[in-house]
Protein backbone atom coordinates (compact mmCIF):
# COMPACT_ATOMS: atom_id res chain seq x y z
CA UNK A 1 0.00 0.00 0.00
CA UNK A 2 1.39 3.39 -0.99
CA UNK A 3 1.20 6.31 1.33
CA UNK A 4 0.06 9.77 0.30
CA UNK A 5 2.18 11.77 -2.12
CA UNK A 6 3.11 14.45 0.41
CA UNK A 7 5.80 16.02 -1.77
CA UNK A 8 3.63 16.32 -4.86
CA UNK A 9 0.61 17.42 -2.89
CA UNK A 10 2.60 20.09 -1.04
CA UNK A 11 3.78 21.57 -4.33
CA UNK A 12 0.26 21.55 -5.82
CA UNK A 13 -1.23 23.05 -2.67
CA UNK A 14 1.37 25.82 -2.64
CA UNK A 15 0.49 26.73 -6.22
CA UNK A 16 -3.23 26.90 -5.39
CA UNK A 17 -3.10 28.90 -2.14
CA UNK A 18 -1.72 32.25 -1.12
CA UNK A 19 -0.89 31.25 2.46
CA UNK A 20 2.78 31.02 3.24
CA UNK A 21 3.98 27.76 4.76
CA UNK A 22 6.00 27.56 7.95
CA UNK A 23 7.65 24.65 9.72
CA UNK A 24 7.79 25.34 13.46
CA UNK A 25 10.30 23.08 15.22
CA UNK A 26 10.39 23.36 18.99
CA UNK A 27 12.29 21.61 21.75
CA UNK A 28 9.72 20.66 24.41
CA UNK A 29 12.41 20.20 27.07
CA UNK A 30 14.32 23.47 26.54
CA UNK A 31 14.14 26.03 29.31
CA UNK A 32 12.33 23.73 31.74
CA UNK A 33 9.65 22.97 29.16
CA UNK A 34 8.40 26.54 28.85
CA UNK A 35 7.75 26.41 25.09
CA UNK A 36 4.91 23.91 25.40
CA UNK A 37 2.98 26.26 27.68
CA UNK A 38 3.18 29.02 25.05
CA UNK A 39 2.63 26.86 21.96
CA UNK A 40 -0.96 27.91 21.28
CA UNK A 41 -0.15 31.61 21.52
CA UNK A 42 2.89 31.28 19.26
CA UNK A 43 0.96 29.39 16.58
CA UNK A 44 -1.84 31.95 16.86
CA UNK A 45 0.67 34.73 16.11
CA UNK A 46 1.87 32.83 13.05
CA UNK A 47 -1.70 32.35 11.81
CA UNK A 48 -2.52 36.04 12.29
CA UNK A 49 0.54 36.88 10.18
CA UNK A 50 -0.75 34.69 7.34
CA UNK A 51 1.25 31.51 7.90
CA UNK A 52 -0.05 27.97 7.56
CA UNK A 53 2.05 26.28 10.23
CA UNK A 54 3.20 22.70 10.72
CA UNK A 55 4.31 22.10 14.32
CA UNK A 56 7.01 19.55 15.13
CA UNK A 57 8.26 18.86 18.69
CA UNK A 58 11.78 17.43 18.65
CA UNK A 59 12.07 13.88 19.95
CA UNK A 60 15.77 13.60 20.75
CA UNK A 61 19.19 15.12 20.15
CA UNK A 62 19.86 16.06 16.49
CA UNK A 63 16.17 15.64 15.61
CA UNK A 64 15.90 19.33 14.64
CA UNK A 65 18.77 18.79 12.18
CA UNK A 66 17.05 15.81 10.60
CA UNK A 67 13.64 17.48 10.35
CA UNK A 68 15.06 20.71 8.91
CA UNK A 69 17.07 18.74 6.35
CA UNK A 70 14.24 16.41 5.34
CA UNK A 71 11.31 18.86 5.39
CA UNK A 72 12.77 22.36 5.18
CA UNK A 73 12.64 22.65 1.39
CA UNK A 74 8.84 22.29 1.44
CA UNK A 75 8.39 25.46 3.50
CA UNK A 76 8.82 29.18 2.96
CA UNK A 77 10.20 29.63 6.45
CA UNK A 78 11.43 27.43 9.28
CA UNK A 79 11.17 28.78 12.81
CA UNK A 80 12.75 26.98 15.73
CA UNK A 81 12.07 27.43 19.42
CA UNK A 82 14.45 26.21 22.07
CA UNK A 83 17.90 26.96 23.34
CA UNK A 84 21.09 27.75 21.49
CA UNK A 85 21.49 24.03 20.73
CA UNK A 86 18.10 23.82 19.01
CA UNK A 87 19.01 26.83 16.89
CA UNK A 88 22.35 25.27 15.93
CA UNK A 89 20.74 21.93 15.08
CA UNK A 90 18.03 23.53 12.94
CA UNK A 91 20.53 25.71 11.08
CA UNK A 92 22.75 22.67 10.47
CA UNK A 93 19.88 20.83 8.78
CA UNK A 94 18.96 23.82 6.61
CA UNK A 95 22.59 24.25 5.55
CA UNK A 96 22.36 20.88 3.81
CA UNK A 97 19.65 22.19 1.45
CA UNK A 98 20.48 23.71 -1.93
CA UNK A 99 17.95 26.54 -1.37
CA UNK A 100 17.19 26.79 2.34
CA UNK A 101 14.21 28.83 3.52
CA UNK A 102 14.59 31.72 5.93
CA UNK A 103 15.21 30.69 9.54
CA UNK A 104 13.45 32.33 12.47
CA UNK A 105 14.24 31.79 16.14
CA UNK A 106 12.20 32.02 19.33
CA UNK A 107 14.57 31.72 22.30
CA UNK A 108 13.33 29.30 24.95
CA UNK A 109 16.48 27.95 26.53
CA UNK A 110 17.89 28.27 30.00
CA UNK A 111 19.95 31.39 29.30
CA UNK A 112 18.89 32.56 25.81
CA UNK A 113 22.30 34.10 25.27
CA UNK A 114 22.13 33.86 21.49
CA UNK A 115 18.67 35.42 21.39
CA UNK A 116 19.88 38.37 23.46
CA UNK A 117 22.88 38.82 21.17
CA UNK A 118 20.60 38.82 18.10
CA UNK A 119 18.28 41.32 19.89
CA UNK A 120 15.28 39.04 19.66
CA UNK A 121 12.57 40.47 21.92
CA UNK A 122 11.92 38.74 25.21
CA UNK A 123 8.60 36.98 25.48
CA UNK A 124 7.10 34.39 23.20
CA UNK A 125 4.49 36.67 21.62
CA UNK A 126 6.93 39.38 20.56
CA UNK A 127 9.51 36.86 19.39
CA UNK A 128 6.83 35.03 17.36
CA UNK A 129 5.71 38.31 15.78
CA UNK A 130 9.30 39.00 14.72
CA UNK A 131 9.83 35.45 13.41
CA UNK A 132 6.62 35.64 11.34
CA UNK A 133 7.16 39.19 10.13
CA UNK A 134 8.26 40.58 6.81
CA UNK A 135 11.19 42.61 8.10
CA UNK A 136 14.51 42.45 6.29
CA UNK A 137 16.23 39.24 7.45
CA UNK A 138 19.27 39.61 9.66
CA UNK A 139 22.34 37.95 8.22
CA UNK A 140 24.93 36.41 10.50
CA UNK A 141 27.90 34.16 10.01
CA UNK A 142 27.76 30.44 10.61
CA UNK A 143 31.06 28.78 11.41
CA UNK A 144 32.20 25.20 11.13
CA UNK A 145 34.54 23.22 13.32
CA UNK A 146 35.41 19.66 12.25
CA UNK A 147 32.67 19.88 9.60
CA UNK A 148 30.07 20.69 12.30
CA UNK A 149 28.28 24.03 11.86
CA UNK A 150 27.70 26.34 14.80
CA UNK A 151 25.73 29.55 14.93
CA UNK A 152 26.88 31.06 18.18
CA UNK A 153 29.74 29.54 20.17
CA UNK A 154 32.20 26.75 19.50
CA UNK A 155 34.29 25.50 22.37
CA UNK A 156 36.89 22.85 22.93
CA UNK A 157 39.15 21.81 25.75
CA UNK A 158 38.72 20.96 29.39
CA UNK A 159 35.52 22.89 30.09
CA UNK A 160 33.34 22.14 27.07
CA UNK A 161 31.07 19.76 28.98
CA UNK A 162 30.36 22.21 31.81
CA UNK A 163 27.17 23.55 30.20
CA UNK A 164 25.89 20.04 29.47
CA UNK A 165 26.79 18.72 32.91
CA UNK A 166 25.20 21.62 34.78
CA UNK A 167 21.72 20.69 36.05
CA UNK A 168 18.91 22.70 34.43
CA UNK A 169 17.70 24.12 37.76
CA UNK A 170 21.10 25.80 38.30
CA UNK A 171 21.19 27.51 34.89
CA UNK A 172 18.59 30.18 35.65
Listing of model-derived features with the role each one plays in the protein:
Residues 42, 64, 90, 114-115, ...:
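Hydrophobic packing residues within well-ordered alpha-helices of enzyme cores
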Amino acid sequence: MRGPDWNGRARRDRENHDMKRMLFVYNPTAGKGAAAAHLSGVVDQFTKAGWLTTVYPTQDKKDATRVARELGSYYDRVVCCGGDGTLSETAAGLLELSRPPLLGYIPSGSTNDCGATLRIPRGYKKAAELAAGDEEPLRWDIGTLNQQPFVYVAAFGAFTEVSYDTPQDLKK
